Amino acid sequence: DNSGYGYVVVGVVSGTTLTWGTPIVFESTELRTTPLQVAFDPNTAGSFVIVFQLSSTLVQTVIANTLSGSTLGSFGTAVAFQTTYAANSSSASNKLGFDPNTAGKFALTNVLIAPSPGDSGVVIGTVSGTTVAFAGSAENWDTSDDYPYSNVVWNPNVANEIVVSYIKVGWWAKVVKGTVSGTTVSWGTPSTVNSGHSDYFNLDFDPNTANSFAWAFFNGGTGLGASGAGTLVGSTWTFGSNQTVPTGGSGTTFTIKFDPNQAGKLAVINRGSNGVNFVGSCTAGSVSGTTLTWGSANELTANGDIGGGQQPVALSFSATDTGKFVSVYALGTAGGNELGGVVCQLEASITNLTATNLLGIASAAILD
């Protein structure tokens, strides 16, 4: 919509069919097109928040609501974190993460814009109904210059443990573990995943395999996507070797997620070049120890280039249907500036997606 307002739309999946409802305004002020994130509380049915950034203030803001079936409730009051902290860059796709073991508790990454630009931290917040509250001040993991490209995930197998993946000045990809006690975060020592030019750094834990995680990022040194698997045991990080992500390319974005219904299975969604256009692709993979193996990439659409923002693709796995996930994409001018989605299916015994299990394309709201 040309107004620049914030909209939310509910999609319903039936088999391989994705049907969209009517877009609803949640913020009638101009927003930055990125970053935007919707996050559901895994411990409270229907409870979710939206993270957004006002164009006028550049401050990270959170609003809560509930979803019953396909019906949205009334939005609560939007709450801005401290005005000295900006929202994350468009490169961050997991700005806010809910604690998988505590209802209504989340962590939110941010970067200081004044008085000391570059300080990076996490704030712990809560949701009760449609009321959002920040429980304290930001807990900084680094007081030296960082780029505001950070993501946060909770370790589902270790209580009160979070991991932040971020980009250090110099474009190094780094991770740091935090231990949460109440509203306080105690930080470990940052570790380096890649000591070269990195961007769009994204990490996820396998909820079905203790200590296991995987990552993906754009490797500026090769011009391709890079990914790998590792383990975190206590304070000890072990990183496997980086593997090339199929169809990664300049300007690409990445979201990597594990299937919550089967151990060691995951997917990556990214934007890359097929030699003609920039397209959205999805690739199935598997992890064994610190070894990550990818199948063949599959394009999300046949409509040509995908654009409309720095984060044109995102994915979410079904909590109940093994291997099923939805990817949302934005088509550029070749596709009529539309938003759309596709229902995808991983097969438990394969690492590739084919014409028989990449199904259900549906287009939706017009962007402009």
Model-derived segments and spans:
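Beta-strand initiation motifs
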Residues: 15-22, 68-77, 129-137, 182-189, ...
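Primarily extracellular surface-attachment and macromolecule-engagement regions
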Residues: 20, 73-75, 84, 239, ...
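Extracellular glycan-recognition modules
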Residues: 116
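Extracellular receptor-binding modules and their adjoining Ser/Thr/Gly/Asp/Asn-rich linkers
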Residues: 1, 7-12, 29, 34-42, ...
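Short loop/turn motifs that cap or connect beta-strands within the blades
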Residues: 22-32, 77-88, 137-145, 190-197, ...
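Short, surface-exposed tryptophan/glycine-enriched loops
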Residues: 320
